[in-house]
Amino acid sequence: MTLFSSISSISNPMTSSKSSIASFGSGTSMGSNSIACGGGCGGSDGILGLGLGLSLGLGLGLNLTGGSRSRGGCGGSNGSMGGGNGSCCGI
């Protein structure tokens, strides 16, 4: 059981209501699409996360917004897990 911890501080108008996104997970359920989540998870298609490539994916469903846990729980606007190109943070 490895512990992943990452803090991505991003200041960009594209992040909607998030300028700093912290991702914490413990790699127990890191499967399917959770590993593909960009660390930034900002912008419309995870463009900001593309350069960071932290791929942490919140293994236990812990997220910042209390949203869905289906894909590792990258807290989007309401946990809707938008995107579909590996960016599981739909804003």
From Swiss-Prot:
Chain spans, region Disordered: 1-20, 72-91
Domain of life according to the entry: Eukaryota
GO biological process entries: sorocarp development
InterPro entries according to UniProt: HssA/B-like_chaperone, HssA/B-related
Similarity comment: family membership: Belongs to the hssA/B family.
Protein name: HssA/B-like protein 52
Native organism: Dictyostelium discoideum (Social amoeba)
